């Protein structure tokens, strides 16, 4: 008797689940758009029965306040600031060989690649907030104007998850549905991501694959290998614009790249000799010379505000650098 009751409950549960799926706009749209030669319907049914599926009502609110609608001055303060420049130089210092391997293979400016990684995820520090599935699911149900786009992306995402045996609820990304340290949307990930380290898997959170994928994206979207044309409307500008359709974004990428390039010239500088040079050539010390010292220290792992003032933090950093040298 107990077994019969249990069986009846299971039948009722499955029936309601089927009815819920048939009433689920996201399920219907994905079923229409997904390549069933690649992904079986049974897999889609299983995924849409996951109890972790939910709609996040704060996502439409986030879309109402995108970074790209900010003025250039506001945008610049967000993305070309001292902390991000320092983080970029530090990342470059720690991953220099990898950066140049990627740059050499694709013949793309290494500092453009670094800059995009910095703006997209602050070098892996900021890249998630919602599961990719739930973000796209929410857009389909709560944002009618984005339903078509989001359903295409959700179909692409499930194709990736099925092929690579990834739990669709296991990857978190942005409110828009981009994921990984390079913040690719699913269709772009499927199209442009590469297995740069040849381990057999394209990994959105492993730096070899991330940097390689960014470089590949740029080249596939108009970056002429070896180009030095950074002018507005040139091939580099257009390829970065393809990554994010915003002039502010392009200017931020180019601006941050130049700051990291400039600051990286101080890497591994001899702090003792530079201090000696400044003291001998600038008496008394002026803002320009102290700023140069602060940049040198930042390039070697310190985090100072470049304000041209020889304050306590700068002096302590100099002492620490000197003690390490001794």
Regions found by a protein language model. Name each.
Residues 18-26:
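Cleaved targeting-peptide boundary
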Residues 282-290, 295-326:
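Short acidic, glycine/serine/threonine-rich helix-capping segments at coil-helix boundaries
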Residues 25-26, 94, 288-292:
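Alpha-helix N-cap/N′ positions at the starts of helices
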Residues 4-14:
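Sec-dependent N-terminal signal peptides
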Residues 23, 95, 314:
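Hydrophobic (often cysteine-bearing) scaffold residues that line and stabilize catalytic clefts
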Residues 38-285, 307-309:
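Catalytic glycan-binding domains that act on GlcNAc-containing polysaccharides
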Residues 30-31, 99, 185, 294:
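Generic structural marker for isolated residues within well-ordered, non-membrane alpha-helices
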């Amino acid at each position: 008797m107990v077994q019969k009751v249990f069986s009846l409950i299971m039948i009722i549960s499955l029936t309601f689940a089927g009815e819920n799926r048939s009433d689920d706009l996201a399920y219907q749209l994905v079923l229409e758009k997904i390549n069933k030669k690649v992904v079986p319907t049974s897999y889609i049914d299983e995924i849409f029965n996951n109890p972790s599926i939910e709609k996040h009502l704060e996502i439409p609110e986030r879309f109402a306040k995108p970074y790209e609608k900010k003025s250039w001055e506001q945008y610049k303060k967000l993305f070309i600031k001292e902390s991000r420049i320092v983080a970029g130089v530090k990342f470059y210092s720690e991953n220099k060989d990898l950066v140049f391997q990627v740059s050499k293979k694709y013949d793309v400016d290494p500092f453009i690649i670094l800059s995009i990684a910095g703006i997209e995820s602050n070098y892996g520090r900021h890249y998630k907030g919602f599961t990719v599935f739930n973000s796209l699911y929410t857009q389909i149900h709560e944002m009618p104007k984005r339903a078509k786009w989001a359903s295409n992306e959700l179909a692409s995402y499930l194709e990736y998850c099925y092929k690579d045996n990834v739990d669709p609820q296991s990857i978190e990304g942005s409110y828009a549905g981009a994921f990984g340290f390079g913040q690719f949307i699913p269709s772009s990930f499927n199209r442009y991501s590469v297995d740069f380290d040849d381990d057999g898997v394209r990994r959105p959170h492993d730096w070899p694959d991330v940097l390689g994928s960014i470089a590949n994206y740029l080249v596939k979207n108009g970056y002429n290998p070896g180009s030095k044309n950074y002018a507005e409307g040139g091939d580099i500008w257009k390829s970065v614009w393809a990554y994010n359709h915003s002039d502010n974004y392009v200017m931020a990428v180019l601006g941050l790249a130049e700051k990291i390039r400039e600051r990286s010239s101080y890497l591994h500088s001899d702090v003792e000799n530079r201090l000696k040079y400044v003291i001998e050539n600038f008496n008394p010390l002026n803002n320009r010379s102290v700023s140069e010292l602060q940049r040198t220290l930042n390039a070697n792992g310190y985090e100072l505000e470049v304000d041209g003032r020889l304050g306590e933090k700068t002096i302590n950093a100099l002492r620490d650098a000197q003690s390490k040298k001794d």
